[in-house]
A protein has these predicted regions:
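Charged DNA-binding/catalytic regions of mobile-element recombinases
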Residues: 1-168
């Protein structure tokens, strides 16, 4: 039975019809940058989630240089909001210089006005992938899969502090 027919029958039976949700749009529509031709041109960042033995959540922010495939930073915490993302990026920019592009998905931490404003002030262009298409950020997704398989799945961390020490 199609959704339209189900909604029509619910309405006829005077049942409450669920409201349809609008899809979130991409914050900025910039073309996807070409593959980098050297180091420090395109960075990509994303989150990986896991849990400790004591049921504390781990949220890992991974930042990768797409040319060298080097993990520039893995930040581990229970919660990483936009201000923490800015702090991590500012630390990396001061150490390595600013990239031309920063590729990410459309997570709330990445499309927040604070992060977008900071990137604009630093002269870094954003490159958001299309919603629901993680293969457009293949370098990061590949790294995150290997990070999960080789680090997170092999270790059973007793606490968040132990995970920070081992991962970072």
């Amino acid at each position: 039975m199609s959704n339209a027919r189900a909604f029509r029958l619910w309405s006829k039976a005077e049942l409450q019809v669920p409201k349809t949700r609008k899809r979130k749009r991409v914050a900025a529509s910039r073309p996807r940058p070409q593959s980098p031709t050297g180091p420090n041109q395109v960075w990509a960042y994303d989150f990986v989630f896991d849990a400790c033995a004591n049921k504390q959540t781990l949220k890992c922010l991974t930042v990768i240089d797409e040319w060298t495939r080097e993990a520039l930073c893995i930040e581990v915490a229970s919660s990483i909001r936009a201000n923490r993302v800015i702090d991590v990026l500012a630390r990396l920019v001061s150490l390595r210089g600013a990239p031309k592009h920063l590729r990410s998905d459309n997570g709330p931490e990445f499309v927040s006005l604070a992060v977008l404003g900071w990137l604009e002030r630093e002269g870094i262009e954003t490159a958001f992938i299309a919603p629901g298409k993680p293969w457009q950020n293949g370098t990061t997704e590949s790294f995150n899969g290997k990070f999960r398989d080789e680090c997170l799945s092999l270790e059973w961390y007793r606490s968040r502090d132990e995970a920070k020490v081992i991962i970072e």
